[in-house]
Amino acid sequence: DFRRGKPSNHKKFGEANAILAGDALLNEAYAICFEQSAKGDRYLLASRFLNECAGVYGMIAGQSADLYFSEKGGELSADDLFYIYEHKTGKLLLAPVAVASILAGNKCYLAFENFGRLLGKLFQMTDDILDVTGSNEELGKTAGKDEKENKLTCIKLYGLEGARMRADMCARDCYGVLEGIEGDVSFLRDLVDYVLRRSN
């Protein structure tokens, strides 16, 4: 019901208007992609990649799986969890990293793609951890919501300490990918540090 300490869109303006706002933003994003695609092949490839990350094979698939497993209950596996991670948050954070690499013509595109996927996984792990350890005030949203909604999380599968250990391992994997990329990646390294240690 809250995001960043303020009422969520659907709480402030109603569910119908919130859905319409989402539709409007998606359509505006596609309009921008079409316009930019006229600039050449790299822009066309970047637009296509962004569409795949957001669409039925990306973020929407992950969100749908998240809802499905919450309703299904029963025994769930690490494969189920990491499918959600990779498609829901993974694609969301993968997209800007990989798209920027495509537009820049960077030869390390696949490494950037791998980094973005790992960063999304790390972000979702820390999100699961904060849902258990944080307060409403710290998070700017309702704490403890995952358990109430029967969400499949790394806490549910591994416990708090196990989840923290896996988050640390994932951060090390992120650093490892960055070591293989030429050029200044200090911003991305700082981003990993922030995601691992964030409090909201």
Predicted ranges, named:
Residues 199-200:
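Short cytosolic juxtamembrane segments of multi-pass membrane proteins
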Residues 1-178, 184-196:
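Mg2+-dependent prenyl diphosphate-binding active-site environment of isoprenoid biosynthetic enzymes
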